[in-house]
Amino acid sequence: MVILISFDIDGTLEVGDPPGVLTMDLVRRTQEAGILVGSCSDRPISGQRAIWEKHGIAYDFAVSKHQLPDVKAKFEADVYYHIGDREDLDRQYALAAGFEFFWPDEAVSEPWLNQDGDSKKS
């Protein structure tokens, strides 16, 4: 099963402003398990990329909020998740693009975010 997770940064990831509950180590383990990961944020794309690179995470995409439909068109996955902290931006954009939406404190307990194996296996 191929899983794609889009992360908001501010209010979602620990490196955000304000900091969120999801750690970069959690994101790294998720990516290493074979899940497609990237960011969808209000931050400039260059700033998003710099965060991933600073933490040694091989991200698959870094886009602005309105580009979530482009992510879905580019990557074939069985399920698409967006994790964010705002109703007006994160949740609305995610649902409009056909992503399932999770608040950070909900997502942290989901098994697909805490995988140890290869998510691409059936």
Regions found by a protein language model. Name each.
Residues 81-117:
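Acidic, Mg2+-coordinating phosphoryl-transfer loop and its flanking beta/alpha structural elements
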Residues 53-55, 116-121:
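Short low-complexity, flexible loop/linker segments enriched in glycine and/or proline
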